[in-house]
Amino acid sequence: MKIVQTAGRAALGEFAPEFAHFNDDVLFGENWNNQDIDLKTRSIITVVSLMSMGITDSSLKFHLQNAKTHGVTQKEIVAVITHVAFYAGWPKAWAVFNLAKEVWNVNEGDLPYEDEAMRAHAKEMVFPIGASNEAMQQA
C-alpha cells in the first residue's frame, strides 16, 4: 500500500510551500513508503515517538487512526501505551489513552484478521470465533 499525503499542500501550500513539500513528498512520500519497516511497525514507532514528546493533539490522533488502519488492535495499542508509560511518563499515557479510546472500541481488532465484514461474520456464526462452545463440549 503506497502512502500518499496531501495535507501539507492543502494546509500550507501557499504559505510554506517548501515545508508542505517536505511533509507530503519526503516524510510521507519517501519515508513512509520505505519498505524496510512494515506500516504497522512504523505506525507504532510514530505513536510512541509522539507520546514520548508529549504531543497529544490532532496529529497524534491521526497517527493512532493510522495505526489502527495498519492493523494495530485495541489490545496491542493498550500494551504499547502501558509499556511506554514507564519510560515516557504516566500523565502522557493518560492523555494518549483518552485519544485511543476515541479511535478503538474495547477488543476491536482482536481477531486474527482486520476485515470488518469478516469480523462481523465471525461474531454471528453458529459458533462465533472467540466464544465458548459449551454445546459442542457436551456432545
What are the language-model segments listed below?
Residues M1-T41, L60-K61, T69, A93-A139:
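Acidic, glycine/proline-rich low-complexity segments that act as flexible tails and inter-domain linkers
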Residues N33, M51, K68, F86:
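Short polybasic/polar patches that bind polyanions
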Residues D38, T56, G71-V78:
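Helix N-cap / loop-to-helix initiation motif
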Residues T41-M51, L60, L64, I77-I81:
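Short, structured motif recognition centered on aromatic/hydrophobic residues
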Residues S43, H83-P91:
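Substrate/cofactor-recognition hotspot
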Residues S49-T56, A88-G89:
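Short alpha-helix boundary/capping elements
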Residues Q65, T82-A85, N98-K101:
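Short amphipathic alpha-helical surface patches that mediate protein-protein
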